Amino acid sequence: SKEEVEDLTSNIILLSYLLGKRLGINYKDIDSSLQDKIKLNLIEDHKIEKWYGDLSELLEFLISR
């Protein structure tokens, strides 16, 4: 169901942030690295962006929060 997918996805994101913290990376640096990775994929014209526009949408979301 949609709720189960949302729950699993949010758990993956949560655990990624917590693992990063345990490895000495602060949350802000994780966000910054994520934005840099998205920008690089935009420059490299990643297929997911061509097909769906997901990368630019995600970058806008991250910048706006």
Please identify what each model-predicted range represents:
Residues 1-9, 13-65:
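Flexible "arm" and connector segments at domain edges
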